[in-house]
C-alpha cells in the first residue's frame, strides 16, 4: 500500500513536469536573462566589457537578448503560429477586445500613477526613471529591447507560462498582474513605499492576462505589449 502510494506520487510529479516543462524552462531562461548569465559567462573567459567601446558593447548585449528570444520562439512556435491564424480569422473582434483591454489598463495605470506621485511627491517611479536614463544613453538599443525583447519575454513568462501552471482564471490574472508589477518595482527598489507602483504596473499586467484568458492567444498580448512599449519609448525619445 505504502509503495503503491509512493509510486502514484512519483508518477504524478513526473507527469506534472512533462506537462509543464516548457513553462518551467521559460522561468529558468528568464532567471538566466535577468542575471546576465551569458554576459557573465563571457566575462569568465577574460572579456572585460567595460573596456569595449559603446557601439560593439551594445551590439553584444543585443545579440545576447536575441539568443534568449530565439529559444523562446522555437519553444512556443506552434502557439505563436496558432495565434497568428486566430488573429487573421477574428481580426476585427481581436482588435476591439485588445483596444478595450489596453485602454482600461492605461486608464488605471495613468490614474494610479498620478495619485501615487502625489503621495510620494515624485513625478515617475524609480523604474521609469532608470528606463529614461537608459533611453538617453542608448535610444536604439532601448527601442529594440523595450519594443521587441521585453514584450516577448514578459508575455511568455507572466502570461503564457503562468496561465499554463495556474488553472484558475482569476487567480492566474491576479498572480500574473502582481508578479508583473513586482518585477518593475524590485529592480529599482529604494523603500517600502515603492511597492505602491505595483498597482499601475500590475493593472496593465492584469489586462494583458485577461486578454489571454478571453482568446487563448498569446500572440495577441505580445503584440499589444509591443505597441504599448513602442509608443512609450518613442514618446521619450522624441520628447527627450
Describe every region a protein language model picked out:
Residues 1-28, 32-40, 95, 141, ...:
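Gram-positive cell-envelope targeting signals
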Residues 3-29, 53-58, 80-111, 167-168, ...:
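Interfacial transmembrane-helix boundary/kink motif in multi-pass membrane proteins
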Residues 13-17, 24-28, 59-73, 92-96, ...:
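Alpha-helical hydrophobic membrane-insertion segments
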Residues 21-79, 126-129, 141:
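Alpha-helical transmembrane segments in multi-pass membrane proteins
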Residues 37-49, 115-120, 185-189:
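Juxtamembrane "helix-exit" motif on the non-cytosolic side of transmembrane helices
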Residues 47-55, 80-150, 237:
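Juxtamembrane helix-loop-helix connectors linking adjacent transmembrane helices
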Residues 52-58, 128-133, 192-203:
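Non-cytosolic membrane-interface motifs at loop->transmembrane helix junctions
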Residues 107-110, 114, 118, 136-240:
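Transmembrane helix-loop-helix hairpins at the membrane interface
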